[in-house]
Amino acid sequence: MAEPTITTTYAGQFAGKYISAALLSPSTIDGGGVTVLPNVKFKEVLQNVATSALLANATCDFDAAGSTVTLTEKILTTNDLQVNMQLCKSQFFNTWQSLEMGASQFSDLPKSFQDYLLGYVAGKVASEMETTLWQGAAGAAGGLTDGGFTVLAAAQLPGANIIAPAAVTAANVIDELGKVVDKINAQTNIYGFEDTRIFVSRNIMAAYVRALGGFSVAATSNAGVDNRGTMWYADGGGVTFDGIKLFMAEGLPNDTMLAAQISNLYYGVSLLSDTQEARVIDVSQYDGSDNVRVVMRMAAGAQIGVASDVIYYGV
């Protein structure tokens, strides 16, 4: 079968499903770890409202003198991003053919070769965005204007809300998580809220799972959750610490944690913007090669709403 010649362009809202796959598929976003603002073209104003004591003794008059309302703002600025990738068409076309003919166990098949290529690239972008969302430097090429959440936290949080990290192992993970919860109670009022999370790196989650398996103490005195040892986590269920849910953020660097409410971490994207684009360009008809180029244009940014309500364990 001859290889197809394909040149396809999706622009504006028609590019949405491909840009959405790239921007909303990072594991943190897909798992509901942050608040997504879907239609930010350049800037979004995040308004914070603080009030003084509102209740007073009843009188016959209206008297607002005792109630003070303070409005502050944070700005979420998106950065225009692009993907320019050149792929050898024949290598991917063979894989796509096998998928179309049923030589695969996957049930969701690409309807066309360009869908397959765009899906492949979107998956790569999503993986890169997960890391950028958490630890990308401010203003870095291909990154976010103000940086990822750890960069924002290091720059915005009061010193009392930042904990110097240690090398976390199964032997000390309970103590290190305890430091975070102690700071939550001492410096914020977010304990007990349904959307409060402690976002942890992979190695911290692994250390905690092992610790709960009973191997951070004498095996004779602790056989782990339900006496199952490290097998207790076989179902992959969620875990908590001192009543707070843990969220494994794959983009966090090792030995890093961030405690916050989901409603206080913002991720802005341009899903509804007419400036986004997803394009597949077959250049074989122009230069005789067997190459196809994939182009995507989008925008994304991150911001913390109220910095004083966040605890950061990291550098």
Identify the function of each model-found stretch.
Residues 98-183, 313:
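Alpha-helical scaffold segments that mediate packing/assembly in large oligomeric complexes
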Residues 20, 24, 126-135, 190-193, ...:
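Intrinsically disordered or highly flexible coil/loop and linker segments, enriched in small
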Residues 89, 202-204, 250, 298:
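Short, flexible loop/turn elements at secondary-structure junctions
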